[in-house]
Amino acid sequence: RWYARMARVMGASMKQEYPGTPQEAFATGEEGSIYGSRIMALRERGRVGVEFEADPDAPTFTAWDLGLSDHTAIWLVQIMGDSFHWLDHYAASQQPLAHYVEKMKDWEKNHGVAVTFHLLPHDAARRDAHGISYVENMGRLGLVNVRVVPRTTDVWRGINTLRELLERSFFHARTQEKARGFCGEEEPGGVEHLELYRSRPPGVGGAIAESPVHDGHSHTADAARTFAEAWSHGLLHGTGNGRERGRRARMW
C-alpha cells in the first residue's frame, strides 16, 4: 500500500528513488521531478524543441495559473488528432490583467489562430472586494470565450492526467526559450519549469507530503495542469480534435 501511494505521487521517478532493478537504480533525472522523466522521454523522441506551424483550423486553448504574489503563467496549446502541440508559454508578475489580455491578442495575431477557449483555474470565479470576478474583468477587456476549470480535490489526479497527456505531446522550440523576470533576471523557459517542478521528499518515517513544492516553477506547471484537468472534466469536448477540423502540423 505504501509503495502504491508513493508511486502515485512520484510517477516514473519512483524507479530512481526506490528501484526494483539495477537499471532503475542508475536511471537519471532531476531528484523528485514530477514531470522530468516524461520530458526526458520526449527529448529522446525528438518532441521537444521542435519547429512546427500552428494550424489555424485546429482547436486552440490557453491554460492559465493565477499564482500567489501576483504571478501568472499561461500556455498556448493545440489539439492535433491524438497529440497535443504546446505552441507557446508566457509567465510574468506584477502586471495588470490588461497586460495578459493584450498578450492573448498578440498570440492570436502572431500564430494565426483563434483561441477556442481560455481555460482558467477555479479561483478566477472568486469575487474581489468590489464583487467582480477575474472572469468578469476579462470580459470587460474583450476576452469572453473563457471556461473555468472546477477545483480539484486531489492535485495528484490532475498531475497524473498531465503525465498521460505529456506522452502524446510536442513542444515548440519557443517553449524552451529563456525569459526575463520583472527585474531583468534570466528565468527558465516553459519546458524547463516543468522539468524542475518536484515533489517534496518523504518526511520522518517515510511520511508522504500531500502537495508538491510550491516555488517559482509551480506556476507554469499548474498552468499546464489546468489544461489537463479541463481535458479530464470534458471541457474541451465538442471543440473537435484536430483530426476532424485540422491537419497535422508540418514539422521540419
Language-model features: locations:
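Active-site-proximal structural scaffolding
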Residues: 11, 67-68, 96-97, 187, ...
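Gly/Thr-rich phosphate-binding beta-strand-loop-beta motif of the actin/hexokinase/Hsp70
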Residues: 55-79
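Histidine-centered active-site/metal-ligand motif
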Residues: 219
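Mg2+-dependent endonuclease catalytic cores in nucleic-acid-processing enzymes, primarily RNase H-like
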Residues: 75-213, 232-238, 242-252
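ATPase catalytic-site recognition across NTP-hydrolyzing enzymes
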Residues: 1-64
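Active-site or metal-binding loop neighborhoods of secreted/extracellular toxin and effector enzymes
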Residues: 226
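Short, flexible loop/turn elements at secondary-structure junctions
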Residues: 22, 66-68, 93
